[in-house]
UniProtKB/Swiss-Prot annotation:
Gene Ontology terms: cellular component: cytoplasm
EC category name: hydrolase
Any single GO BP term: ribosome biogenesis
Subcellular location as annotated: Cytoplasm
Keywords assigned by UniProt, alphabetized: Cytoplasm, GTP-binding, Hydrolase, Magnesium, Metal-binding, Nucleotide-binding
Organism: Karelsulcia muelleri (strain GWSS) (Sulcia muelleri)
Residue span, Obg domain: 3-160
Cofactor: Mg(2+)
Name of protein: GTPase Obg
Length: 327
């Protein structure tokens, strides 16, 4: 589990300066001053960004907001070119968007090991060996290296989770993700226990790992910024499957179901076009008659499963349903 989830950060980046070319003349026996042989400066290091499917947050960059690449080295005698500066690579989760401070999208990282150059390093300056000509046999000048580029980037993460768990506060989302993945979120009996998106990975039989995101509880008006607001709803946009969760403890199932549907519809209508499943949690509190009453209240077109993290009812059915769709 990621205790300190971060999905938005600003970082200052500077690529490396190019090394300078040098002024140097060949020295040989019996020759006081030979021809120019000053080498070129090395190229400054680039700033790159790389996708890493083992990362699920950009929290590791929270206290490293200055990324500076190495400068190129100056040239040497005998026309030796200075070594290039080392690149600085920013590792980010899949689904990271890179913007400028005006919110314009620059690039998006969508694949593991996908690598993009954010800033090129400065070019190395030329040594004096380049400036010899018929009019000037002994040039006493060389070029300085080009300065590196500076820029402030905004990194925003939209999680590329396979499954998004959505529900009202205290509906049992965190308990569910702790039961079917290795995630251990904070769980308590009060609303908004989940203050950040929790990420868990489900490993089941021969299926590839399945990433599940527990989105903080949605309340009426969430799409307009109420409660924890829409800042977390953006993570749902990239989920392949949406799992709606209603607690068996609520009384008006249809009402709370409609709150979730309406908020998602206001935020992004395309979310409701995704594969989805309705889960009634804490079903150990229900007898068969109450389950039947709930089913009558809910829309007939919804696929639903009753689950209990206490009795384990429905958990394997839920896992199988998710795996079957993703396969």
């Amino acid at each position: 589990m990621l205790n300190k989830f971060t999905d938005f950060i600003k970082i200052y980046c500077k690529s490396g300066d190019g090394g300078s070319g040098i002024i140097h003349f060949r020295k040989e026996k019996f020759i006081n001053r030979g021809g120019p042989d000053g080498g070129d400066g090395g190229k400054g290091g680039n700033i790159l960004i790389r996708g890493n499917n083992k990362l699920f947050t950009i929290s590791h960059l929270k206290y490293k907001k200055h990324i500076i690449a190495e400068n190129g080295k100056n040239g040497g005698r005998n026309r030796i070119t200075g070594s290039n500066g080392k690149d600085s690579i920013i590792e980010v989760p899949i689904g990271t968007i890179v913007k400028d401070i005006y919110n314009n999208i620059i690039i998006e990282i969508l694949n593991n090991n996908e690598e993009k150059i954010l800033l090129f390093g400065g070019k190395g300056g030329k040594g004096n060996c380049h400036f010899k000509n018929s009019l000037c046999k002994t040039p006493f000048y060389s070029e300085k290296g080009e300065s590196g580029k500076e820029f402030i980037f905004v990194l925003e993460l939209k999680i590329l989770a396979d499954v998004g768990l959505i529900g009202l506060p205290n509906s049992g989302k965190s308990t569910l993700i702790s039961m079917i993945t290795s995630s251990k979120p904070k769980i308590d009996n009060y609303p908004f226990t989940t203050l950040n998106t929790n990420i868990g990975v489900l490993n089941y039989k021969n299926f590839k790992k399945i990433v599940i995101a527990d989105i903080p509880g949605i309340i009426k008006g969430a799409s307009k910024g109420k409660g924890l607001g829409f800042e977390f709803l953006k993570h749902i946009q990239r989920n392949k499957i949406i799992v709606f969760i209603l607690s068996a403890e609520v009384i008006y199932y249809k009402k709370y179901y409609n709150i979730i549907i309406n908020e998602l519809n206001f935020f992004d209508k395309n979310i409701l076009k995704k594969k989805r499943l309705l889960v009634i949690s804490k079903s150990d509190l229900l007898d068969q008659e109450l389950k039947y009453e709930i089913i009558k209240e809910l829309p007939k077109f919804e696929k639903y499963i009753f689950i209990s993290s206490f009795s384990k009812e429905g958990l394997y059915e839920l896992i199988y349903y998710i795996c079957n769709i993703l396969s």
